[in-house]
Amino acid sequence: MTLLSLDVVSVRFGGIAAVREVSLRLARGEIRGLIGPNGAGKTSLINAITRVVDIQSGSISFEGRDITALVPESICQLGIGRTFQHVELFREETVFENILTGLYRHYVYGFGAALFGLVGRAEEEARRECHGLLDAFALTQLAHARAGDLPFGIQKRVDMARALAMRPQLLLLDEPVSGMSESEANEAIATTRNIARDRGITLLIVEHNMRVMMQLAERITVMHEGRVIAEGSPAEIRSDRGVIDAYLGEETELA
């Protein structure tokens, strides 16, 4: 079943075409990779899906609903979450508090909720879920550390945990393991994949670590100069001469 549909979507910044008539289908529960050289339009495409940037033509649908004209807050409420290439944490807050903010839209508010004790129950449940994510991403010992004081790779793990705390149906990850060591990247990706599968979350992942991408993604979409130039299984993409030439050059093989 298709969860997300993009139909001939184009994004321009002045005279520059960042995304050129891209069409894409994501099935519910799929893990899709999105690759391409710098400037290929990958982040611009994610920004278009989450309505951070406007699209000049085309349409975007989520669960069969046209979301092209929605604002970012409405996109989030529908169950579309994301991380950013450059981490955007609350730097003065603790790791625990940052992850807790991911659950804000699931809290129960209002006089009736307070009267029947539902607010307290919801907060207790949220805290339990946060502790579970802290443990899953090996962040328990850093729960009370100020997020802004942490190394970039650890901040990336906090960002991924916070995004999963939103309980999204679709999660867009923009270079999630940049700044991590190889072992950290392997662990973070495995954790994200396992949680996503357990919860039925669809993943769209932009990542330059080709070895990680080839191991993680079920299908891969390749962009070059704003266009989709190939789509297929990791094995198909790995052996596609056009992809190798466009993405890495004549002398390099995909991992």
What are these regions (language model features)?
Residues 1-255:
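Glycine-rich phosphate-binding loops of nucleotide-dependent enzymes
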